[in-house]
UniProtKB/Swiss-Prot annotation:
PANTHER family: ATP-DEPENDENT ZINC METALLOPROTEASE FTSH 2, CHLOROPLASTIC (PTHR23076:SF139), METALLOPROTEASE M41 FTSH (PTHR23076). Its cofactor is Zn(2+). The gene is ftsH. InterPro entries: AAA+_ATPase, AAA_lid_3, ATPase_AAA_core, ATPase_AAA_CS, FtsH, P-loop_NTPase, Pept_M41_FtsH_extracell, Peptidase_M41. The lineage of its organism: Eukaryota, Sar, Stramenopiles, Ochrophyta, Raphidophyceae. It comes from Heterosigma akashiwo (strain NIES-293 / 8280G21-1). The keyword Metal-binding applies. This is ATP-dependent zinc metalloprotease FtsH.
Length: 663
């Protein structure tokens, strides 16, 4: 925009401001009630037909009603829409001389006309004369507030549009030439398609999820050499949905596809579609696919698609809100009346359970790829990728780190090595050692390290509590192995006991669940066995919540109780408006609920008694372990097992099935 156009735009703003100022000045002039009302009063005084000039004396309305009852009123003339009346009264009691009096008629005097007719009074009505000046002033007065609101809103939109357009040429209306152009821009996607995307990520940077990587390598091959697949009648998948917990590499996979395919690529978040203005989301979806059609083959990546793809009609009454309109448009664009050839939509979410069924069907998202946390071999491969630019000590084994980080995803493993590097730099070490790795693992799992426990009594209580957990984990065959026991406070915990969980958490036996319940109750059992029931602390509150949840799942989900092999809970649990709607919390009778409560109590009591028995039978081992723990504040699982092995038989396990009643 040249200098002349810029000056013209500024003149437009000045004229708008001047118009608003004139309206405000006029409003202030009318509010003063000086010039106008003086002029109006002078006009009325000079007008012989005005009510003020018809009668000089006033009379109260109550007195008027009294005169009507006595028959003294002969004629009455109404002025100003019946608000003022001029009456002519005559009577012998009034000196037989007619009097003309002015009366102000109150609002709501509906019975006056009837009384006048009964008294045979001559009634005359005079229509109000049009006061042009007053009409204009009333009209302007009624337009002042709406005009100011419109003007302020107009200027607000211009300022917002100028900020969004990042205008550098000095024009107040931006390069679009005005607010109308910018308002139309609300339905446009601001991000441009990357013709040759350079994300810096390729499939060489992806590790630990080889099966998933193979799926996407096939899509990349299809985009590069479609004839290889079309020769046998195959068509490219229209959509791929990545599902998995946070931090497992879903977004990283999309970056790798963009870096490998070398085709136009555009990425957008699901939350960018929905705005406060109705219809903007659907317009942005249309604009997105219009851009993609201009550069086919093309890849569209929608991150966190659950922000716009939630189940329609959720909640009470459903509703056709902005999110549903956006979803409907997305469904149409992906597989509607018009076909989109050469456009591959890749989406990622960690809440696939709340997505709309129409979005998940073949033809839209042909493939649903689950990205789970990596296994041990996958973690080793991921650690090798992230350790490329880290100076690790030769004594460090990635296999050992992978063994200690069961359940970690790619993002957590990357953060782990980064935390270890930060700790090494803080201690001014040239390389990352085993100590830094251990501290980083503890920091990622439990949080920042807190000050040591100074009070000897509390330290001893915490030591017995944590040793109780570790004792059960060491002695029970079905329990996870002890990894570490520490008295160093981290986060809100005064002490911690780590276990090495099973590599496949999806397959857990009944004995493993029961052993975990006994292990969780081991801390409280140690407190009772050593200090007595009066010295039981509140430190086991989190353990009790975990125990109750495990016992409840044994009964409701897995059929591992005396109630029998039944499942009393549906997948997804009880939800309220979270993408699906309403579901009652309990889907069984009250009588069965009582039995469930009894079973929960039975399981927890039997497991707690077992934990107390373990502490009583292995008191010497427990005391020795606590002595070493208080002295060193940290014991590894191997060190703890050596202490226990001198005075306890490893492992000890009982048949729990016989303890649970069938009825």
């Amino acid at each position: 925009m040249n200098k002349k156009e810029t000056n013209t735009s500024w003149w437009r703003i000045i004229l708008i401001s001047l118009g608003i100022s004139i309206i405000c000045i006029l409003a202030a002039f009318l509010a003063m009630k000086d010039g106008f009302f003086v002029l109006e009063n002078n006009t009325k005084n000079n007008n012989p037909d005005s009510p003020e000039n018809k009668a000089s004396s006033k009379m109260a309305y109550a007195r008027l009603l009294n005169y009507i009852e006595k028959g003294w009123i002969k004629t009455i003339d109404f002025y100003e829409n019946g608000q003022i009346a001029i009456v002519e009264a005559s009577s012998s009691e009034l000196s037989d001389r007619p009097q003309r009096l002015r009366v102000e008629i109150p609002a709501g005097s509906t019975s006056l006309i009837g009384k006048l007719k009964e008294a045979n009074v001559d009634i005359n009505a005079h229509p109000p004369k049009l006061d042009i000046f007053k009409t204009i002033s009333d009209t302007l007065g009624s337009l002042i507030v709406p005009g100011l609101v419109v003007a302020v809103f107009y200027l607000f939109l211009e300022r917002a549009n100028n900020n969004n357009n990042n205008n550098s040429n000095g024009s107040p209306f931006g390069p679009g030439g005005g607010p109308n152009q910018n308002m139309r821009g609300l339905g446009e996607i601001k991000k441009e398609i990357q013709k040759e995307p350079d994300t810096g990520i390729t499939f060489k940077d992806i590790a630990g999820i080889e099966e998933v990587k193979e799926e996407f390598e096939e899509i990349v091959t299809f985009l590069k050499d479609p004839s290889r697949f079309t020769a046998v009648g195959a068509t490219i998948p229209k959509g791929v949905l990545l599902v998995g917990p946070p931090g497992t590499g879903k977004t990283l996979l999309a970056k790798a596809i963009a870096g490998e395919a070398k085709v136009p690529f555009i990425n957008i978040s699901g939350s960018e579609f929905v705005e406060m203005f109705v219809g903007v989301g659907a317009a942005r979806v249309r604009n997105l696919f219009e851009k993609a059609k201009q550069d086919t083959p093309c890849i569209i990546f929608i991150d966190e698609i659950d922000a716009v793809g939630r189940q329609r009609g959720a909640g009470v009454g459903g509703g056709n809100d902005e999110r549903e309109q956006t979803l409907n448009q997305l469904l149409t664009e992906m597989d509607g009346f018009e076909k989109n050839k050469g456009i591959v939509v890749i989406a990622a979410t960690n809440r696939a359970d709340i997505l709309d069924n129409a979005l998940l069907r073949p033809g839209r998202f042909d493939r649903q790829v689950t990205v789970n946390p990596p296994d041990r071999a996958g973690r080793v491969a991921i650690l090798a990728v992230h350790a490329r630019n880290k100076k690790l000590s030769p004594a460090i084994s990635l296999e050992t780190i992978a063994q200690r980080t069961t359940g970690f995803g790619g993002a957590e493993l990357a953060n782990l090595l980064n935390e270890a590097a930060i700790i090494s730099a803080r201690e001014e070490k040239a390389e990352i050692g085993s100590k830094e790795i251990s501290l980083a693992i503890e920091r990622v799992i439990a949080g920042l390290e807190g000050p040591s426990i100074a009070d000897n009594k509390n330290k001893r209580l915490v030591a017995y509590h944590e040793a109780g957990h570790a004792m059960v984990g060491t002695l029970l065959r079905n329990h996870d192995n002890v990894q570490n026991v520490t008295l160093v406070p981290r986060g809100q915990a005064r002490g911690l006991t780590w276990f090495m969980p099973n590599e496949d958490p999806s397959l857990v036996t009944r004995g493993q669940i029961v052993a975990r319940i006994v292990g969780a109750l081991g801390g409280r059992a140690a407190e009772q066995s050593v200090f007595g029931s009066t010295e039981i602390t509140t430190g086991a509150s989190g353990d009790l919540a975990q125990v109750t949840d495990l016992a409840k799942q044994m009964i409701l989900r897995f059929g591992m109780s005396g109630i029998g092999p039944v499942s009393l809970s549906k997948p997804g649990g009880s939800f309220l408006f979270v993408g699906r709607g309403v579901r009652p919390s309990n889907e069984y009778s009250e009588a069965l609920a009582i039995k469930i409560d009894e079973q929960i109590r039975t399981i927890t009591e039997l497991c707690y008694n077992e934990a107390v028995e373990i502490m009583d039978l292995n008191r010497i081992s427990l005391d020795l372990a606590v002595t070493g723990l208080i002295q060193d504040e940290v014991l590894t699982g191997v060190s703890f097992e050596k202490v226990v092995a001198d005075f306890s038989k490893l492992p000890t396990n009982k048949i729990y099935e016989s303890k649970f009643p069938k009825k």
